[in-house]
Amino acid sequence: MGVRAEAQPAARVPKVGLLLPTTAAAAGYNVEALKQGLREAGYVEGKTIALEIRYGEGDSARFPTLARELVSLKPDVLVTSTDPAIAAVRRETRTIPIVMAFSTDPVATGFVASLAHPGGNVTGLSNIASEMSGKRLALLKDALPGLSHVALLWNPDVRGAVLEYKEAEAVARSLRLELQSVEVSGVADLDRAFEAMSSQRAQAFFLLPGNPIAFSKRLEIATFGQKRRLPSMFPTREYVDQGGLMSYGASLPAMYHRAGTYAGKILKGAKPADLPVEQPTKFELVINLKTAKAIGLTVPPSLLQRADQLIQ
């Protein structure tokens, strides 16, 4: 009588939980970039990795519930983006590794002890935002040499945005610009923000990064700028693709791609406490010439020469 071979148990497939602060449509390219990063680390969705994705729809009030739901699934790694979403996930767990795809200032927010030595369960990418607002404001001034009054859209609930707002104030003083603070903390604030910019007669507007509400509504924001013939500056090119005038910043898909490789390292045994937080080194200036024409703006040739991409 032959000996029956024992069936081998199926190998466990690791699980990654992903909390995206925006809509599925807005996050599409970023999700694909993250999956590519995981693939390069040897993890293919549906074969060697399982993904659990939740979308915040640009509403930070939903983040705590979605974070709790993801943590209850006991993933091996959590990936998220923007300070409100990172904070929501971190409140739910101090043991499951968390990879930040985008954070304004993780040291100031307390997510990590330092960029070189995170020290806890959080690591990933920082956008060094506090150093960027001045450059963006200066570029906006270069586009409009006669600029004197700029509306600044921001979310005061985002700690990194508070730091960047202070930076923008300092640079504005040096450029002799008057800043109008326009707070956007919820979807309902957007119409009020548009009304405030119109009534105060802003000559241009400038969006601080890390605002999932604004990212989810970037088409509406860009459309407002065109209708009011207001030049605009944004932190990422996704706004310019939707009709905004200019952006200066790192590539979001590139950061999500890198977050995927971080998740892969952790799945292979690396500890987030020992993985330094990375900062982007390449920043792109993108100008939408179609929008410039629509709002009656002639972009100075010197600025056009500095652009990394011109959208015709």
Enumerate the language-model features and the residues they cover:
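Short hydrophobic alpha-helices and adjacent helix-cap/hinge residues
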Residues: 1-312
